[in-house]
Design a protein with these regions (language model features):
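Flavin-dependent oxidoreductase catalytic cores
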Residues: 1-181
Length: 181
């Protein structure tokens, strides 16, 4: 689904709650949430579970200022320990499989995605999607798939890793899959 604010969900905001309406023909479906507060993330996970999606996805990748300024989305890339703590709490708050979407890092000096992948896997996520840019890059410049490839080929990683960024054709998707794993 379109990502949903956990604050909107726990306050029962119409705009957020409407996004939980799932039609059978939409299945399988995942519901994606974003937020930065531990209690809100846990409560939202419980609310999402009641909607019975197949997957709960956490968005730690949105680079938009109004999300980032609240330390949500890609903003959490400035505090990896907090990201891991929030993810651990969400995983423990639901019976749904939890996945995460994120970026390489906050900027070119803080591309800690290899550490992040291992730590999030260790708290129980079932898959990780990585956008090949930093938050600072937003959607500019070329996506860097090198780190995504390193993670996919890391023998310690046993969850699915999905890369994205700059894939604009089936041919390019196949080329990147062959090159990066």
């Amino acid at each position: 689904t379109e990502f949903i604010s956990v604050e909107g969900l726990i306050r029962d905001a119409d705009k957020s709650v409407q996004k939980l309406d799932i039609y059978e023909e939409e299945r399988p479906i995942g519901i994606q949430i974003f937020g930065a507060e531990l209690d809100s993330m846990m409560r939202a996970a419980e609310i999402v579970e009641e909607a019975k999606p197949e997957v709960l996805d956490i968005n730690y990748g949105c680079p938009v200022k109004k999300v980032v300024c609240k330390m949500a989305g890609a903003g959490i890339l400035q505090d990896i320990d907090r990201m891991v703590k929030l993810t651990d709490a969400v995983v423990k708050s639901t019976n749904l499989p939890v996945t995460v979407k994120t970026r390489l890092g906050w900027d070119e000096k803080t591309m800690y995605i290899e550490e992040i992948a291992e730590r999030l896997q260790d708290v129980g996520i079932k898959a990780l999607s990585i956008h090949g840019r930093t938050r600072k890059q937003m959607y500019k410049g070329e996506a860097d798939w090198t780190l995504i490839g390193n993670i996919k080929n890391n023998p310690r990683i046993h969850i699915p890793i999905f890369g994205n960024g700059d894939i604009d054709s089936p041919q390019k998707a196949l080329e990147y899959r062959n090159r990066y794993g």
